[in-house]
């Protein structure tokens, strides 16, 4: 190999190594920018749709909301026990009729979450407090109902689940469907007054738990502790 050819090969090798180093450094920088929250980087927002904020007036103690495919929004009012309808950005004056009796006699009791079945947004689920009498004393429990939404009213209202345990704490309840169409229902109220969350560790009550239910309110067969 001649001296001139050897020199050309060395120059080519050096250029290749430098080029690879630049690419590697750039890749490392990209990775760092992608995963290191402490490094500032530019986020392109020019192709994001415009967002219009429309204030909705007239709601009282709104607790939760759910969206229909047609754009309607259902909103629960916790302390009034009303189910309200927002359509085309405006609150409909009349509330949805057919809602069962909601117990609102204690602080933080009332109508709570609202959710639609993933296969049919006319099938609606609500959680709320229900008044019961135990040994002559007025108590409250959390229940789950299912109903059919017919325009501006509920039909076929059915109580499909009642939580075990008297709610003497703050048993707020939320709903969410999983990808396999099981219904998750959270229940607060783990604290008994000034206690330390005893209900959360008590398998005999549902308070302080996250429940996994079928869409008819029955427990899923492969749930843990299903026989307790």
Task: Label every model-predicted segment.
Residues 26-194:
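Acidic, Gly/Ser/Thr-rich repeat motifs that build Ca2+-stabilized beta-propeller blades
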Residues 185-192, 218-226:
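The feature captures the short pre-catalytic strand/loop hairpin that immediately precedes
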Residues 17-29:
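Bacterial Sec-dependent signal peptides at the C-terminal "C-region" and cleavage site
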Residues 140-151, 199-216:
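Beta-propeller blade signature
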Residues 8-20:
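Bacterial N-terminal signal peptides
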Residues 193-201, 227-228:
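Short helix/strand-bridging catalytic loops that position acidic/His residues to coordinate divalent metals
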